[in-house]
């Protein structure tokens, strides 16, 4: 199948690692990274499955499926096998479920990579979803949800999700709870294990997976191992986010809302959210990066310098927070002082006026110059960045494979 060699990939000048990109017969795309100097090995697998695919009647199912894949498969049926193996091999494993993807990853001592890949591949070939462990893990989901209820960022994001269009997948409760994953299905005459099998078989497929593997072995050895273990992952030829109708804008036209949130912990913030079309297809131009650079500027004449001078705010950040294949959310977050809270309307006017001045009244050549400077700095940062440690390298390479190489770029 298709492959890209180390020589055809762009990488930092100081990066001595060797890379290879291959596609297996089952259409699973893989980045192989060989680093003879590493003491740790790592792997990460991303699949185009996320919370937006949760059935309305079983919200949190994608997240629950992520949990269950760790709890045994036909080849390694013990519930704690993989986590235990990573732990005794000086490593760890974890996973997370987002709106439009789920990512599984691990790191451990380099000499155990071969056996770890054997175990890891079982997640995606033959999970068991045993009834006893399903019941046990429901309690883990409930505990996680109870913990999240006390976390202000999660509370704020759930509020934001609730403002989406009625019926849009963004509105769904991605974490799930005992009520949504047990009580409601039982009341409807079904059980969660049936939903798990149906979801896994209808949403997981090798052709929508991307795998990154980093080890001390040479590229040929890593490729042999990956083919040995991951060629058995079923290819159901699914579309990314199977069964979800495309909708570029989850919010109604003219979406304008203002909410006052009572936090759990003491904090004073003013946050603005601006929904935009997904920026994934614009990975080369990164249009929101220019906006982030200008608004987040901290020098004389900036929004932050004015807020500090007035004693209204101490920190300001601007950038793309939430991203998905449907939309992006550009966020401006200001840490307010106690004196600044009553002046939030003036601060809002200041921000909108600042943006209007920069992007409507500034000469075009000024913005072009700023853009050119940003491009030059990012290129220098890429070329001369220091070597990334193993777990971050594997996750970063996985993200690069998912977002960039999939679009025919040659930069890792």
Regions found by a protein language model. Name each.
Residues 1-40:
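N- or domain-start disorder-to-order transition segments that initiate the globular core
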Residues 266-286:
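Polar, glycine-rich mid-to-C-terminal structural blocks
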Residues 49-59:
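Short pre-active-site segment immediately N-terminal to the catalytic Zn-binding motif
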Residues 113-116, 219-224, 282-283, 339-346:
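Short, conserved charged micro-motifs
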Residues 2-9, 44-47, 64, 68, ...:
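Acidic/histidine-enriched segments that form metal/cofactor-coordinating
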């Amino acid at each position: 199948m298709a492959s890209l060699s180390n020589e055809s990939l762009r990488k930092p000048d100081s990066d001595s690692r060797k890379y290879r990109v291959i596609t297996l017969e089952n259409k699973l795309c893989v980045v192989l990274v060989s680093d003879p100097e590493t003491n740790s090995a790592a792997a990460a697998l991303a699949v185009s499955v996320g919370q937006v695919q949760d059935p309305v009647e079983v919200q949190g199912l994608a997240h629950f499926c992520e949990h269950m894949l760790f709890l045994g498969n036909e080849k390694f049926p013990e519930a704690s096998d993989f986590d235990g193996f990573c732990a005794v091999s000086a490593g760890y494993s974890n996973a997370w479920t987002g709106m439009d993807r789920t990512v599984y990853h691990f790191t451990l001592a380099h000499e155990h990579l071969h056996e770890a890949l054997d175990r890891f591949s079982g997640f995606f070939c033959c999970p068991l979803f045993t009834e006893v462990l399903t019941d046990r893990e429901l309690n883990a989901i409930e505990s996680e949800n109870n913990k999240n209820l006390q976390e202000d960022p999660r509370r704020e994001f759930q509020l934001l999700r609730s403002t989406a269009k009625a019926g849009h997948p963004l509105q769904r409760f991605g974490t799930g709870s005992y009520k949504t994953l047990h009580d409601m299905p039982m009341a409807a005459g079904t059980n969660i294990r049936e939903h798990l099998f149906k979801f896994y078989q209808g949403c997981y497929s090798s052709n929508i997976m991307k795998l990154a593997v980093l080890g001390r072995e040479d590229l040929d050895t890593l490729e042999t191992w990956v083919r040995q273990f991951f060629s058995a992952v079923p290819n159901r030829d699914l579309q990314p986010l199977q069964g979800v109708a495309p909708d570029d804008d989850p919010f109604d036209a003219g979406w304008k809302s203002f909410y006052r949130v009572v936090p759990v912990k003491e904090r004073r913030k003013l946050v603005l959210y601006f929904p935009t079309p997904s920026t994934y297809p614009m990975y080369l131009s990164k249009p929101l990066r220019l906006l982030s650079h200008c608004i987040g500027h901290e020098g004389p004449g900036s929004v932050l310098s004015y807020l500090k001078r007035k004693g209204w705010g101490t920190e300001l950040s601007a950038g793309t927070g939430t991203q998905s294949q449907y939309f992006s959310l550009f966020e401006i977050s200001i840490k307010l002082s106690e004196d600044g809270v009553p002046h939030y309307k003036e601060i809002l006017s200041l921000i909108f006026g600042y943006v209007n001045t920069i992007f409507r009244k500034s000469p075009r050549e000024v913005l072009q110059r700023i853009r050119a400077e940003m491009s030059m700095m990012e290129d220098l940062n890429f070329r001369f960045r220091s070597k990334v440690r193993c777990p971050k390298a594997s996750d970063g390479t996985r993200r690069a494979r998912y977002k960039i190489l999939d679009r025919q770029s040659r930069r890792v």
